[in-house]
C-alpha cells in the first residue's frame, strides 16, 4: 500500500469551476450577443431609413409649393450699381433705371479743441437728435468731461439710433465727428447744449451744432457739416422718383432693390423681372437627389454581399423587411404613373429617367427646355392634389408619422433589446448560482481529499513502524 495514491489534497478548483460555468453559459451568451448586435444594427438602419424618407419628404413639400412656381427673379445688368429681388406679386418685364443721386446720411464735425490733452468741459447737458429722433440726454460732469469722455458717452447714447462719434485731429486741433446711419431729407444731426458755466476750463457750448445754420466744413477750427442728410433720386423708364433710402421697395410693385452708386448719364441699368426658372430646376434636382439618396440607402441595406469563398455573406440590415419592400414598390409605381390631365405626362418628358439600380438621372438640357417651353405643364405635373409631389408625399406619410410604420418597427426592436437585457440578467444570476454550487461541491471534494491524504499518511506511518515494515528479521 506504500505505493497507493488516492489524490492530492488542498487542490484549487477555481479555474475548473470557471471553465464549467463559462461552458454552461457560452451558447446562450453567444445567442444573446448575436441577437443584440442584429437588433441594434436594425435599429440604426431604421433611424437612417426614416431620416432619408424625411429628407425626401422635405424635397417633395418644396416641389409642391406654389411659391416655387410663382417665384420671380430680378436681375440687374450691373449689380455693382443696383441689386434687386422680386416677390411673387412682381410682374415680368424689363425696366430701365437711372440712378441720379444716392440718399445720404448726416455727418458733422464739431468745433476743434486746440489743447485736447488739457481740455475739461464745463458741466451741463448734451441733447442730440437725428431729425425727429432724440437720443437720451447726456449729462456732462467730471466723469466724462474730456473729448474722449464725450465720444464714449455719445456712442453709448447713440447705439440704438445709429449715431456714432469719433475723434479726428487736424491742423486746428482735435474734434468730435458724428455720423448717422439714417438717410433722407430732414435726418440731419443736431447738437443742443446746456452749459452750466463751471466745472471745467472749456466751454461746453463749443460742442453745439445747428444743421440749419452750419456751413460746409472747411479749413479752420469752426464746426461744419461733412455731408447733409438728403434724398436720392432715380429714374425708372423716364419717371423720376425721390428716395429717402438707398434700399427701395415701393417704386416697382413686388420688386426691392439696393442702389449702391450713381449711373453714368445716358447709361441706365437694365432690370429684368422674370419667372424663376432656375429656382424650379433647382427644386427638381433636389427632388431627384433626395430620391436617389433614399434609393441608394435601401439598396445598401437590402443587399447580400459575398466576402469570400470560405466566409458567410454579409447581409444588409433591412434585408427581407416587408415595410421596405412595400415602400420601394409604392415609389416606383408612382414614378411610372402617367399624368393624363396635363401636357407633361411623365418624368421622361422632363429628361428624368430610371437607371439600372433604381436611381434617377437627369438630362439637364431636356429639363431646361421643358421648363422654358411648358412652365405651366411642369408646375401641373408636380403640384396640386393630383401632382406627383403630393402623391408621393402621401405614400411616405404612414412611414414617418408618429406611431407610424417605422415607429412601430422601432418600438418592437427596442422591446427586443429590453428582453435581451432581461435574459442576460437572468443568465448572469443562473450562472452565479451554478458557480456557487460548483464551488461548494468542489470545496467538499477538496476537504475529502485532505482527509484521505491524512489517513493514507497515518496508515503508511503505522506500517513503517512494524518490525517487518523496517526490513529486520525477528
UniProtKB/Swiss-Prot annotation:
- Residues forming coiled coils: 408-454
Task: Please report the name of this protein according to its UniProt entry.
Answer: B-type flagellar hook-associated protein 2
Assembly behavior: Homopentamer.
Query: What GO cellular component entries does it have?
Result: bacterial-type flagellum filament cap; bacterial-type flagellum hook; extracellular region
Q: Where does this protein reside within or beyond the cell? A: Secreted; Bacterial flagellum
Mention one GO biological process in which this protein takes part, according to its record: bacterial-type flagellum-dependent cell motility
Note the SS bond partners.
none
Family according to the record:
Belongs to the FliD family.
Known role: Required for the morphogenesis and for the elongation of the flagellar filament by facilitating polymerization of the flagellin monomers at the tip of growing filament. Forms a capping structure, which prevents flagellin subunits (transported through the central channel of the flagellum) from leaking out without polymerization at the distal end. Essential for motility. Responsible for adhesion to mucin, which is the initial event in colonization by this organism of the airways of cystic fibrosis patients.
Q: Which UniProt keywords apply?
A: Bacterial flagellum, Coiled coil, Secreted
InterPro entries linked:
Flagellin_hook_IN_motif, FliD, FliD_C, FliD_N
Main location (coarse class): secreted
Name one matching Pfam family.
Answer: FliD_N
Amino acid at each position: 500500500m506504500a505505493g497507493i495514491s488516492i489524490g492530492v489534497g488542498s487542490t484549487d478548483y477555481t479555474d475548473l469551476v470557471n471553465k464549467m460555468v463559462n461552458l454552461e453559459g457560452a451558447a446562450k451568451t453567444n445567442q444573446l450577443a448575436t441577437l443584440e448586435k442584429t437588433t441594434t444594427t436594425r435599429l440604426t438602419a431604421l433611424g437612417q431609413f426614416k431620416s432619408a424618407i424625411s429628407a425626401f419628404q422635405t424635397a417633395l413639400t418644396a416641389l409642391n409649393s406654389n411659391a416655387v412656381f410663382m417665384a420671380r427673379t430680378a436681375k440687374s445688368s450691373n449689380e455693382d450699381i443696383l441689386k434687386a429681388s422680386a416677390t411673387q406679386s412682381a410682374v415680368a418685364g424689363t425696366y430701365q433705371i437711372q440712378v441720379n443721386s444716392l440718399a445720404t446720411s448726416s455727418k458733422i464735425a464739431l468745433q476743434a479743441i486746440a489743447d485736447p490733452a488739457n481740455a475739461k468741459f464745463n458741466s451741463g447737458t448734451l441733447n442730440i437728435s437725428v431729425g425727429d429722433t432724440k437720443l437720451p440726454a447726456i449729462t456732462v460732469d467730471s466723469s466724462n468731461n474730456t473729448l474722449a469722455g464725450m465720444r464714449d458717452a455719445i456712442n453709448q447714447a447713440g447705439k440704438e439710433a445709429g449715431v456714432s462719434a469719433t475723434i479726428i485731429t487736424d491742423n486746428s486741433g482735435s474734434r468730435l465727428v458724428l455720423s448717422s446711419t439714417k438717410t433722407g431729407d430732414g435726418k440731419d444731426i443736431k447738437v443742443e447744449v446746456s452749459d452750466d458755466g463751471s466745472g471745467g476750463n472749456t466751454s461746453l457750448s463749443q460742442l453745439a451744432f445747428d444743421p440749419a445754420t452750419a456751413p460746409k466744413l472747411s479749413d479752420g477750427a469752426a464746426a461744419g457739416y461733412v455731408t447733409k442728410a438728403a434724398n436720392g433720386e432715380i429714374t425708372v423708364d423716364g419717371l423720376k422718383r425721390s428716395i429717402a433710402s438707398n434700399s427701395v421697395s415701393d417704386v416697382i410693385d413686388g420688386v426691392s432693390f439696393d442702389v449702391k452708386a450713381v449711373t453714368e448719364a445716358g447709361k441706365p441699368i437694365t432690370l429684368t423681372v422674370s419667372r424663376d426658372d432656375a429656382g424650379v430646376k433647382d427644386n427638381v434636382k433636389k427632388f431627384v437627389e433626395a430620391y436617389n439618396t433614399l434609393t441608394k440607402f435601401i439598396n445598401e441595406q437590402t443587399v447580400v454581399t459575398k466576402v469570400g469563398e470560405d466566409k458567410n455573406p454579409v447581409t444588409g440590415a433591412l434585408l427581407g423587411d416587408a415595410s421596405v419592400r412595400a415602400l420601394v414598390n409604392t415609389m416606383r409605381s408612382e414614378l411610372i404613373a402617367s399624368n393624363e390631365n396635363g401636357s407633361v405626362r411623365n418624368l421622361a418628358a422632363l429628361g428624368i429617367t430610371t437607371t439600372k439600380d433604381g436611381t434617377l438621372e437627369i438630362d439637364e438640357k431636356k429639363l431646361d427646355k421643358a421648363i422654358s417651353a411648358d412652365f405651366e405643364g411642369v408646375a401641373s405635373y408636380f403640384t396640386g392634389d393630383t401632382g406627383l409631389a403630393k402623391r408621393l408625399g402621401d405614400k411616405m406619410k404612414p412611414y414617418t408619422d408618429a406611431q407610424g410604420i417605422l415607429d412601430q418597427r422601432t418600438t418592437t426592436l427596442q422591446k427586443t433589446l429590453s428582453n435581451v437585457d432581461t435574459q442576460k440578467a437572468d443568465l448572469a444570476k443562473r450562472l452565479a448560482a451554478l458557480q456557487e454550487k460548483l464551488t461548494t461541491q468542489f470545496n467538499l471534494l477538496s476537504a475529502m481529499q485532505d482527509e484521505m491524504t491524512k489517513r493514507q499518511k497515518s496508515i503508511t506511518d503505522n506500517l513503517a513502524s512494524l518490525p517487518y515494515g523496517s526490513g529486520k528479521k525477528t
